[in-house]
Each structure stands twice: as structure tokens, then as C-alpha cells.
Amino acid sequence: MSLLRARGLRAFYGDFQALFDIDLRVEDGETIAIIGANGAGKTTFLRSVAGALACGNAMIEFDGRPIGALTAHEIVRLGIAMVPEGRKLFPSLTVEENLLLGGYCGRSGAWTLARVYELFPMLAERRALQATALSGGQQQMAAIGRALMSNPRLLLCDELSLGLAPVVIRDIYACIGAIIAEGTTLVIVEQDITRALDASTRFYCFQEGRVALAAASRGFDRDAITSAYFGL
């Protein structure tokens, strides 16, 4: 049984249909990449899984349980957390207060405040600062740490590298490797094809709200990926 399964998933913003019959599975312990151009439906898929966008109850299952009709906080309690695009930290709160918010769902596990600070030492040094005082890379670390504080079985990461310098992106993805080593299952949305394939075991390429290509990440023909990415 897959940890996450989407069957015929459709998603709408009002009358606009953003996803068309998405079939996607994530096995326990995998790292899945979702790639595609802007507007392909990648973020919409993550929002549907995380409960931020309503969809049919039977269209998404987590560990065999339908979750499409659940609220976002119910889904977090089941073990799904999301690192949203743009970080979405609370600017009036300190770094540590932002992190502690992630633990309010009450799930037990390896990820504690001390463990997050071990993963991101610079957050420990800046724990008393307001989130707005952090650099973009540090804010991304705080957003990841906040999600980890809920001790998720499945971590959804939306555009981790967006707007960050290459050296910062490298450090962020090195930390993602440490999270994977802890046994966390990941779904990573990323526009950088090379980075997405290097970080994942399998990938799905979205194009205009549909799955255009799905395959193992290692050794797949890059020309075929590029064609699916741009709809050529």
C-alpha cells in the first residue's frame, strides 16, 4: 500500500480547473520530485494534499485513508506537513516561536526543537530574532524546521530554491539529505530539473494540470524530460 495515493485528482479555483485526473503515488521512504513550468499545477497538487484546497474525499489517500475532505489541521495531525512557497513565516514572532508553532499538533517523534537547531545551527544563534530579520535562506530553514516540528511522515516542499543564491540552495539541499536519512518521505516541487532529479528517486512532470511524464529519476533521457516539461 502506498503512503500517498492520488487517483483521478481534479482541483478547481472557482470555475477554473487546475488539475485534470492526476494519478500519482508515493511509497514510504521515497523522495518524489514534481517538476514543470510555472502554472503546471505543481503547487495546486501540494495544496490539495495538505488540505489547503478542497477536493473530492476519495481522490487522495494517505496510508490507505481518504483525506480529501479533511481540514489542513486534521491532515497535519495525521502526519503530513508542508513547507510552502515563499516560506510564510509569522513576521511578528521570533524564530523560536515560529518553530514551536509547528509542534502544536502534538505528534511525537525524533524532531524536537533541539534536533531542529542541530540541523540548522544558525537558527539557534538567531532564535530570539524576529523572522523578518533573517535572510531568505535562513527563513527557508526556519520554514523547514517549523514543518519538521510536527514530526511528519510525509513532508511536502514547495520551491525550496526559489529566489535563493546557489550557495544557499546547496546548503538547503544538503539538509534535505539529512531529513531523508531520518526516514522521512518527501515530495519536492522544483523547477530546476537537474536538482530535482538528483534529489529524488522518481519524478512526475506536470504540464498544464496533467501528468505528462512519470519515471525513475536516475538515467532517464533528459531530452524526453525537456519535451514533457515544455509540452513539445
Spans of model-derived segments:
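Glycine-rich phosphate-binding loops of nucleotide-dependent enzymes
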Residues: 2-232
